[in-house]
Amino acid sequence: MKEFFRMLGELKYMIPVLRYKWPDPDSNASLAHTFQDSTEKFAERPFVYFENETWTYSQANKAANSFARYLVKNGVQHGDRVVLFMENRPYYVISLLALNKIGAIGVLINTSLTGDPLIHCINSSDSIKCIVGAERAKPLEDVLDQINISNKDDLLWVEDNKDYGLPVWATDLKSNLDFNDDENLEETNLVTSKDTACYIFTSGTTGVPKAAVLPNRKLIAAAVNITKAGYRINHEDCMYNCLPLYHSTGLMLGLCGAIHVGASSFIKRKFSASSFWTDAHKYNTTAFVYIGELCRYLDNQEPSEAEKNNPIKSMVGNGLRPDVWDSFKDRFDVDRIIEIYGASEGNALFMNLFNKNKTIGMTSADVALLEYDVAEDEILKNEDGYCKKISNHEPGLLAIEIGPNAVFNGYTDKDASEKKILRNVFKDGDAWFNTGDLIKTVDVGFAFGKEHYQFVDRVGDTFRWRSENVSTNEVGEILNGFTDVNMSNVYGVEVPGCEGRAGMAAFSLEDVKNFNWNAFSEHVENNLPKYARPLFIRIIQEMDTTGTFKLKKNELRDESFDLNKVNDIVYCLKPSSNSYELLDREWLDKINSCKAGY
């Protein structure tokens, strides 16, 4: 009965979400409007805490207005695309707000990218300017002669509090701003709900990074529902946000949610398990936007005085695995863990509205779990050629029907968007978004008859590591670009004690003894971000393919780097090294006992 009455109390928060109507496409519902509304109400309240800085809503709004006017005077118009390549800090937020105020599109670049992936993201976006933080100027400088933004006036450099000098090829942004010209802009009145707010790059299911299109209405809908039914915070709360703002979790579930209710945000460049609870007490962070990996790190820390009586009461995020959930919630006395599930490019959101355990919750969208053959990497169909639904609690491929209430914005690349759509699934003419994820239904007890779900795994050509989606095809192309590597087969493998899957690659060599591992290691380091670098390399005799020449991954994935199953030579990349070395049983034992440091 206790659970029944608790659930009745949840109803008052759930009903507004179920009744929520998306903003009219032509209405003035944008991130900029939401921010300006909160500024009017809470002008002198803290907006952002960062290192030794505190910005009020009023200060941030004035800075964003000055920046927006500079952009307009220098040719940036409604609908133009502008690259934002900077670590988490106040001027990242101000830059994003400035762009939104004039209807420009922020092209949010992963700060770990270098080389070809960085070139691709910039050039494929067709951006006219680039805002670069001083801390990321070096990787941008390395590719200047290969990107389509070359004019000094279009490369806007933003100083950091570290000792960086202004590059000769860039313009010092802050020294060119008129901070006296800081009133709200008329241009903001022309920004609508349907306008694109930003591009967030995702590897999707295959190939190079693709730009997912996020309109203002998607940011606002997420912010409204997450704060109402998720965090349940208001303007007196402070959110702990150490996730990268170029990702949808840190941006949509974190920053946008805080802005919607006028709350404060404590932002960090990067997560630190050792200082987490000290920071939480210092800034009285009552809410936390998370990914599961961070929770595992915190739970693996030795108990400390700082974690006791901590202020965090509610958390919203994704990827918290069942084996960590209970331990984390009990140890740190967190009242609400609101796990969500969704994709930047996707058309629906799952949310654990009822604060149940070990579930991504429910959704208002029309969804189906399709029978899927993992070994053959294909959807199973009936004799009529239509897909078959899972009829029990077994995992199935999650598909979400595309319709007026579940719009698929997709990517800027129309061909890539089409590849994510399943057609004629249950009847001729229907269309469903293929998430590429295996999901199952779970019994969570009394839930007003609402079906609840749990994430199981990713399928196909993508795996997730260090909270990043990694495309096996993209990594494979980089590896194949090295001399003596003819064809590599890349896949994700589980590492004990770690979230997601780490990269592993298999390839054959004509001359194993004379293969230049130092040069290969350097090639990997220079061309792949750290999260995408394969941690394990298996040297095989011959590449195994299907009848249609698709690389077979299933057996390789199952054998992983287990030396008891693998007769081939396996090399590994240790956490403190950038060079591959032979995997021996001593290091394998450390990995299996969760003492390797991955």
For every predicted segment, state its role.
Residues 23-28, 33, 44-89, 93-97, ...:
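Conserved AMP-binding/adenylate-forming core of the ANL superfamily
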Residues 260, 282-290, 299-373, 407-408, ...:
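Gly/Ser/Thr-rich phosphate-binding loop
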Residues 489-496, 504-508, 517-598:
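Conserved C-terminal "lid"/linker of ANL adenylate-forming enzymes
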Residues 157, 178-201, 208, 231-238:
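Conserved pre-ATP/AMP-binding loop-to-beta segment of ANL
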Residues 56-58, 190, 197-221:
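Conserved AMP-binding A3 loop
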